[in-house]
Curated annotation (Swiss-Prot):
It is found in: Nucleus speckle; Nucleus, Nucleoplasm; Nucleus envelope; Nucleus membrane. The gene is RBM15. SMART domains: RRM. The modification N6-acetyllysine is found at K450. The record marks R954, G955 as: Breakpoint for translocation to form RBM15-MKL1. The modification Omega-N-methylarginine is found at R578. This is RNA-binding protein 15. It comes from Homo sapiens (Human).
Length: 977
C-alpha cells in the first residue's frame, strides 16, 4: 500500500495511473486501454517513459515476475506499511500501492506544481485508512477495488447532463448548421420543423472563439418540457444540405451547478458536484482526451476525496470551464427569450436579481394578456421606412392583412405604424422574434395595438383533444352561434356569433379557458367577418370547411342549436346537409311528379325547372329538418294552426322570420289559399308519422322526399291535376288585370280568386309585368313575384327599380307602399335619411323584425328597372322632370361608400292611422343583407352591385339613429358616382 516513503518515484507515475483498472476485468481492461490511447495524444512526457507502459499493457497480467521485482524495489523505502504478509499478498499489495502512488505523484508533479506538498499530505491523510484495511489480505484489497469502481461509476452517472434523471429541459441547441443559408432562412426552416410539437421560438446566435471562426448555433425554446422532449426524440436526425445537424438538450439544472452564487447560497450535493466535475472533465468538443488535464483527474481515491470535501464545503468550487462569452449569455436567458423587451439588455447577462423581471415578463402569455390581439404597434420606426420594408421583415411570421404607417406631422419627430396579422398566433410570434431588431437604422419597439371588435372570433390553442361538440358547448353560453368553422385536429377555429355583444362577452371570458386540461388554455381574438362568408356565397358548391355538431351534442341542447339554425342563411343549410350526407352527390335529380305535372300545365318551356325544383326540395328539407328536430309528432300541424289568428291581424313573437322563409316566398298571405300548397298540406296530413320516421332514419333529404311522393302518388294524382288546371285558368283570367298594377289585387276583399292570382303571379318576370302580362310564362323568375315598381329618389337623382318579394307577407308591402292621403299606389320612394351599418343598429332591426311577427314585415329585393315604367301622375312627372335619371348601381355604390342604409317612412306623406305605419330600410350588399338571399334571388340580381335589400317593418313610425342627408354633399357624391 501507499505511504509517505513512496513519494520519490514521481517520474514513472503517469504510466501507472492508466493501468489502474487492468486488474479488474477484461472488459474494464479494454475500456482503459482506449482511454489510455486517448490520453497519450496530448501527454507531454518523454517517449522512453511511454514505451514500458505499452509493453506492460500488451502483456497484461501475465508479466507477474517483472511486477514483483518492481514492487520489491519500491517496497524497500516504505517497509512500515505492514504489507509483508506472504509472497502473494506482498506482490498484490505492492501492485495496488504502486498504482495509488503513481497517481498521487502524477497529480503532484504535473497538475499541482506549486502545491505538491499539500496535495501529497492530503493523499496521505486520506489513504491511511485504506492502508490499515489493506493489511487484512486479498479480501480487503478486492473490496477496496470494488469501491473504487463504484465511485467511478457513480461519478460518471452524476456527470450526465442535467445532473440526474429528473432534470428537465425546454431548450434544444442545434449546431453544425453550416454557412450555405442565411440566419433568417435557418430560423424559418427550424421553426417549421419544430412548430408541430408545440409553442416554439427560434433564436440564432454566433459563438466566438470556437475553432478558426465564429460558430453559428440555434436555440429552439419550447413552452413545455414534454414538447421539447418529443421534438428531440422525433427529430434526432435533422438534415440540412445533406448534413446531419447536431441536436443537444440544454438542461435547466446545468446553469445552477456552474454558478458561484448558487453554490454559496445552497450547499452542493454529491450529484451536483459530480455533474460539475464531469462537466469540467468533458468540455464541449474535447471528448475524453482532456481527462488527465482537469483538476479532478487524479486517482480513484483522490476523486472520491474531492467529492467528499466539496460536499462538506472545505474546498472552493472548481473553476468554470473556458466557455465563450456569447455562449454563456445564451445559456443564461434561453427561457426568457420569447418576450424580452428590446430596451433592457442587463437581465440577459445577470443570473441573480436581473433575471427576476424576465421571469415575470415570461409569465404574461397570450392566454393571460388581455391586450394581446392580432394588431401590433411598431414604434421608433425609421422615417424612410415603407410598407414593403415592413412586409418584407414580418411576412415570414404569417399573413399580413393591413399595414398602416403614421408619418410625423409638424412638431413631431417619431414615426410609428400598425401591422395587422390574420390571427393572434402570427402577431405573437412576430412580436417575440422582432422586438428590438433593427429595421433600416432604428431598433423597433413592438407592442399590441387596439383590438377591433367583430362578430367573428378566432380561437387558438386547440388540438385533437377538442371535439366540435365541446367547443360549441362552451361558447354557446354567451349568445346565439351562427356557424363554427373547425375540423377536429386543427389548432384554431372560427366562431361566428349573431350579435356583437355575444362575441365581445366570449372574447372577454374565454381567454385562457382550460379546454382540455390546465396546460391547454385557449387564445381568443377577433377576426374578419367578410372574407370567409363571401366565399361561401360566391362558391356554394364546394364542400364547406366546418363540420356540423355531432348527434350527441345535438341531443344535449337542441334549443340553442335550433335558434342558430333558424338564423343561418339557407345556403349554409345546404352545405351542412352535404356534410351530413356525403354519399349524396347533390346533383339535381329529375323533378318529382308533382313539380313536373304542375310545370307542364302552367308553362310551355320549363326554362327554370331544374333550379326551381332543386330549390323547392331544399327548402322543403330545411323546413322538415327544423320541424323534425323539435321531436314532436304534432309539430307539423302547429304552423297551420298558428295561421288562423295571424290572418286576423294577430302577431306571434315566438316565430323568427327566417323560420318562415320557405313558406313566405310564395306570394300568398296564407298557404290555405294556394292549391299547390294545399295539396302539399294534404300530403303531409296523409302520412302523419313522417316526422318521427325522418328523425330516426333519414339517409338523405332527397330520398325521403321521393319515398313520400311515391307512397302517396296514386291517391293524389287527380287532386294535383285539378289544382294545376284551376291555377292555369285563374292565371289566364287575371293576368291582364295584374299587368296594369300589381297592387290592385290587394284592394279587393279576401277570396279565392285574388289569392290564386297572387300564387300564380310569382311566375311572372318584371318584363312581363310591365308589358301587361301577355308574354308567355316560360321565362318567369322562379319563386319571386313583383311587389312594386317605380323610382327611388335621392335628392336630385332618380333610380328606376323593381322590387320582388323575398320573405314575409306581401300584404305588408301592399298596404304601406301607398300614398298616405289618397291610399293609391305610390310611384316614387324618396330616401331622406340614412342609418349607419353598425352592429347594434343592425341588431335592433333584427329585433324589430322578430317583434313584428310573420305578418308584420316584408323583405324585398330591389333590382334595376326600366325607365318606361315611369308613372304618368302629375306629381311623379314633376319630380322626375327636375331630377336626373341614373342607374341603380350608383345608389348602391353611394350607400356602400357611406356604410349606411337608406331609410323611408311609410306610407309616403304620412297617415292619420297610427296602426298602418311602418319604415323601410334599403340595405346595400353586405353581410347583413346577404343572409336574406338564396340562389334564385342571386340569379335575379345578376351582380353584386345592382341590388338592394328592402326591409319593411309595420308598426314602427320612428327610425333608429337615422341621419338626414346634406343636400350639397349628396348631389356632389352622386354626380361623381
Amino acid at each position: 500500500m501507499r505511504t509517505a516513503g513512496r513519494d520519490p518515484v514521481p517520474r514513472r507515475s503517469p504510466r501507472w495511473r492508466r493501468a489502474v483498472p487492468l486488474c479488474e476485468t477484461s472488459a474494464g481492461r479494454r475500456v482503459t486501454q482506449l482511454r489510455g490511447d486517448d490520453l497519450r495524444r496530448p501527454a507531454t512526457m518523454k517517449g522512453k517513459e511511454r514505451s514500458p507502459v505499452k509493453a506492460k499493457r500488451s502483456r497484461g497480467g501475465e508479466d507477474s515476475t517483472s511486477r514483483g521485482e518492481r514492487s520489491k524495489k519500491l517496497g524497500g523505502s516504505g517497509g512500515s506499511n505492514g504489507s509483508s504478509s506472504g509472497k502473494t499478498d506482498s506482490g498484490g499489495g505492492s501492485r495496488r500501492s504502486l498504482h495509488l502512488d503513481k497517481s498521487s505523484s502524477r497529480g503532484g508533479s504535473r497538475e499541482y506544481d506549486t502545491g505538491g506538498g499539500s496535495s501529497s499530505s492530503r493523499l496521505h491523510s486520506y489513504s491511511s485508512p485504506s492502508t490499515k484495511n489493506s493489511s487484512g489480505g486479498g479480501e480487503s484489497r478486492s473490496s477496496s477495488r470494488g469501491g473504487g469502481g463504484e465511485s467511478r461509476s457513480s461519478g460518471a452517472a452524476s456527470s450526465a447532463p442535467g445532473g440526474g434523471d429528473g432534470a428537465e429541459y425546454k431548450t434544444l441547441k442545434i449546431s453544425e448548421l453550416g454557412s450555405q443559408l442565411s440566419d433568417e432562412a435557418v430560423e424559418d426552416g427550424l421553426f417549421h420543423e419544430f412548430k408541430r410539437f408545440g409553442d416554439v421560438s427560434v433564436k440564432i446566435s454566433h459563438l466566438s472563439g470556437s475553432g478558426s471562426g465564429d460558430e453559428r448555433v440555434a436555440f429552439v425554446n419550447f413552452r413545455r418540457p414534454e414538447d421539447a422532449r418529443a421534438a428531440k426524440h422525433a427529430r434526432g436526425r435533422l438534415v440540412l444540405y445533406d448534413r446531419p445537424l447536431k441536436i443537444e438538450a440544454v438542461y435547466v439544472s446545468r446553469r445552477r451547478s456552474r454558478s458561484p452564487l448558487d453554490k454559496d447560497t445552497y450547499p452542493p450535493s454529491a450529484s451536483v458536484v459530480g455533474a460539475s466535475v464531469g462537466g469540467h472533465r468533458h468540455p464541449p468538443g474535447g471528448g475524453g482526451g482532456q481527462r488527465s488535464l482537469s483538476p479532478g483527474g487524479a486517482a480513484l481515491g483522490y476523486r472520491d476525496y474531492r467529492l467528499q470535501q466539496l460536499a462538506l464545503g472545505r474546498l472552493p468550487p472548481p473553476p468554470p470551464p473556458p466557455l465563450p462569452r456569447d455562449l454563456e449569455r445564451e445559456r443564461d436567458y434561453p427561457f426568457y427569450e420569447r418576450v424580452r423587451p428590446a430596451y433592457s439588455l442587463e437581465p440577459r447577462v445577470g443570473a441573480g436579481a436581473g433575471a427576476a423581471p424576465f421571469r415575470e415578463v415570461d409569465e404574461i402569455s397570450p392566454e393571460d394578456d388581455q391586450r394581446a390581439n392580432r394588431t401590433l404597434f411598431l414604434g421608433n420606426l425609421d422615417i424612410t421606412v415603407t410598407e414593403s420594408d415592413l412586409r418584407r421583415a414580418f411576412d415570414r411570421f404569417g399573413v399580413i392583412t393591413e399595414v398602416d404607417i403614421k408619418r410625423p406631422s409638424r412638431g413631431q419627430t417619431s414615426t410609428y405604424g400598425f401591422l395587422k396579422f390574420e390571427n393572434l398566433d402570427m402577431s405573437h410570434r412576430a412580436k417575440l422574434a422582432m422586438s428590438g431588431k433593427i429595421i433600416i437604422r432604428n431598433p423597433i419597439k413592438i407592442g399590441y395595438g387596439k383590438a377591433t371588435p367583430t362578430t367573428r372570433l378566432w380561437v387558438g390553442g386547440l388540438g385533437p383533444w377538442v371535439p366540435l361538440a365541446a367547443l360549441a358547448r362552451e361558447f354557446d353560453r354567451f349568445g346565439t352561434i351562427r356557424t363554427i368553422d373547425y375540423r377536429k385536429g386543427d389548432s384554431w377555429a372560427y366562431i361566428q356569433y349573431e350579435s356583437l355583444d355575444a362575441a365581445h362577452a366570449a372574447w372577454t371570458h374565454m381567454r385562457g379557458f382550460p379546454l382540455g386540461g390546465p396546460d391547454r388554455r385557449l387564445r381568443v381574438d377577433f377576426a374578419d367577418t367578410e372574407h370567409r362568408y363571401q366565399q361561401q356565397y360566391l362558391q356554394p358548391l364546394p364542400l364547406t370547411h366546418y363540420e356540423l355538431v355531432t348527434d350527441a351534442f345535438g341531443h344535449r341542447a337542441p334549443d340553442p342549436l335550433r335558434g342558430a339554425r333558424d338564423r343561418t342563411p339557407p345556403l349554409l343549410y345546404r352545405d351542412r346537409d352535404r356534410d351530413l350526407y356525403p354519399d349524396s352527390d347533390w346533383v339535381p335529380p329529375p323533378p318529382p311528379v308533382r313539380e313536373r305535372s304542375t310545370r307542364t300545365a302552367a308553362t310551355s318551356v320549363p326554362a327554370y325547372e331544374p333550379l326551381d325544383s332543386l330549390d323547392r326540395r331544399r327548402d322543403g328539407w330545411s323546413l322538415d329538418r327544423d320541424r323534425g328536430d323539435r321531436d314532436l309528432p304534432s309539430s307539423r300541424d302547429q304552423p297551420r294552426k298558428r295561421r288562423l289568428p295571424e290572418e286576423s291581424g294577430g302577431r306571434h313573437l315566438d316565430r323568427s322570420p327566417e323560420s318562415d322563409r320557405p313558406r313566405k316566398r310564395h306570394c300568398a298571405p296564407s298557404p290555405d289559399r294556394s292549391p299547390e300548397l294545399s295539396s302539399s298540406r294534404d300530403r303531409y296530413n296523409s302520412d302523419n308519422d313522417r316526422s318521427s320516421r325522418l328523425l330516426l332514419e333519414r339517409p338523405s333529404p332527397i330520398r325521403d322526399r321521393r319515398g313520400s311522393l311515391e307512397k302517396s302518388q296514386g291517391d293524389k294524382r287527380d287532386r294535383k291535376n285539378s289544382a294545376s288546371a284551376e291555377r292555369d285558368r285563374k292565371h289566364r283570367t287575371t293576368a291582364p288585370t295584374e299587368g296594369k298594377s300589381p297592387l290592385k289585387k290587394e284592394d279587393r276583399s279576401d277570396g279565392s280568386a285574388p289569392s290564386t292570382s297572387t300564387a300564380s303571379s310569382k311566375l311572372k318576370s318584371p318584363s312581363q309585368k310591365q308589358d301587361g302580362g301577355t308574354a308567355p310564362v316560360a321565362s318567369a323568375s322562379p319563386k319571386l313575384c313583383l311587389a312594386w315598381q317605380g323610382m327611388l329618389l335621392l335628392k336630385n337623382s332618380n333610380f328606376p327599380s323593381n322590387m320582388h318579394l323575398l320573405q314575409g307577407d306581401l300584404q305588408v308591402a301592399s298596404s304601406l307602399l301607398v300614398e298616405g292621403s289618397t291610399g293609391g299606389k305610390v310611384a316614387q320612394l324618396k330616401i331622406t335619411q340614412r342609418l349607419r351599418l353598425d352592429q347594434p343598429k343592425l341588431d335592433e332591426v333584427t329585433r324589430r323584425i322578430k317583434v313584428a311577427g310573420p305578418n308584420g314585415y316584408a323583405i324585398l329585393l330591389a333590382v334595376p328597372g326600366s325607365s318606361d315604367s315611369r308613372s304618368s301622375s302629375s306629381s311623379a312627372a314633376s319630380d322626375t322632370a327636375t331630377s336626373t335619371q341614373r342607374p341603380l348601381r350608383n345608389l348602391v355604390s353611394y350607400l356602400k361608400q357611406k356604410q349606411a342604409a337608406g331609410v323611408i317612412s311609410l306610407p309616403v306623406g304620412g297617415n292619420k292611422d297610427k296602426e298602418n305605419t311602418g319604415v323601410l330600410h334599403a340595405f346595400p350588399p353586405c353581410e347583413f343583407s346577404q343572409q336574406f338571399l338564396d340562389s334564385p334571388a342571386k340569379a335575379l340580381a345578376k351582380s353584386e352591385e345592382d341590388y338592394l335589400v328592402m326591409i319593411i317593418v309595420r308598426g314602427f313610425g320612428f327610425q333608429i339613429g337615422v341621419r338626414y342627408e346634406n343636400k350639397k354633399r349628396e348631389n356632389l357624391a352622386l354626380t361623381l358616382l
